[in-house]
Amino acid sequence: MQTAYWMMVMMMVWITAPLSEGGQLNDVIRGLVPDNLAPQLVLQSLDSRRHPHGIRQDGAQICIWKICPPSPWRRLGS
């Protein structure tokens, strides 16, 4: 139980420390997610099952999540 408590404390420090240095919460959260778990790549892997050869036919560009501009639906929510 004590180990779980200290793990939670360390995770909170790890997440909030960059905020005290002027970072934004979205940047901190995105920094915790590996690039191969980007939403675009997950959707592409799910969608590739529908296409022969595993390649999307519309030629959609998939970029690295950390440097992509936000999609239009994310802009509307903010």
UniProtKB/Swiss-Prot annotation:
Residues 23-56, 74-78 form a propeptide. Expressed by the venom duct. The keyword Thylakoid does not apply. Residues 1-22 form the signal peptide. One of its GO terms (cellular component) is extracellular region. Coiled coil: none annotated. The modification D-tryptophan is found at residue 65. One of its GO terms (molecular function) is toxin activity. The modification 4-hydroxyproline is found at residues 69-70, 72. The keyword Transcription does not apply. It comes from the Eukaryota. It is found in: Secreted. Belongs to the conotoxin C superfamily. Consomatin family. This peptide is an evolutionarily optimized stable analog of somatostatin. In addition, it adopts nearly identical conformations as in the somatostatin drug analog Octreotide. As this drug, it contains a D-Trp at the same position, whose synthesis is a common strategy used for enhancing the metabolic stability of compounds in drug design. Moderately activates human somatostatin receptors (SSTR) with a preferential activation of SSTR1 and SSTR4. In vivo, does not cause behavioral changes in mice within a few minutes of intracranial injection, but causes a progressive loss of movement thereafter. Four to five hours after injection, mice recover, even with the highest dose tested. Shows antinociception and antihyperalgesia activities in two mouse models of acute pain, most probably by acting outside the central nervous system. This is Consomatin Te1. It comes from Conus terebra.
